[in-house]
Amino acid sequence: MELTPREKDKLLIFTAALLAERRRARGLKLNYPEAVALISAAVMEGARDGKTVAQLMSEGRTVLGRADVMDGIAEMIPDIQVEATFPDGTKLVTVHQPIV
């Protein structure tokens, strides 16, 4: 199977998000890469479902709360930018203050 670098990146994010979901389900607090992956994957899947950029910017802030991440992680992530594929093309989605 031949994948483009972009497709490889998407698969890596999805895999990290899957791991983060499992750890979160076990009651573990997420670290920086796990938190970023989980929020990024939620944005990418929302785009694939046909949601708008504005909806995803808003929904991206509800994926995780401070109680879901290790101490100091929320402050380490002022915003997350995700290049997501929408029905009408690829767009950059920025989620400001993703962990509140």
UniProtKB/Swiss-Prot annotation:
Subunit structure: Heterotrimer of UreA (gamma), UreB (beta) and UreC (alpha) subunits. Three heterotrimers associate to form the active enzyme.
Main location: cytoplasm
GO biological process: urea catabolic process
Localization terms from the record: Cytoplasm
Naturally occurring in which organism (per UniProt): Polaromonas sp. (strain JS666 / ATCC BAA-500)
Catalyzed reaction equations: urea + 2 H2O + H(+) = hydrogencarbonate + 2 NH4(+)
Protein name, entry field: Urease subunit gamma
SUPFAM superfamilies the record matches: Urease, gamma-subunit
EC numbers for this chain: 3.5.1.5
Signal peptide: none
Protein family (similarity comment): Belongs to the urease gamma subunit family.
Keywords on record: Cytoplasm, Hydrolase
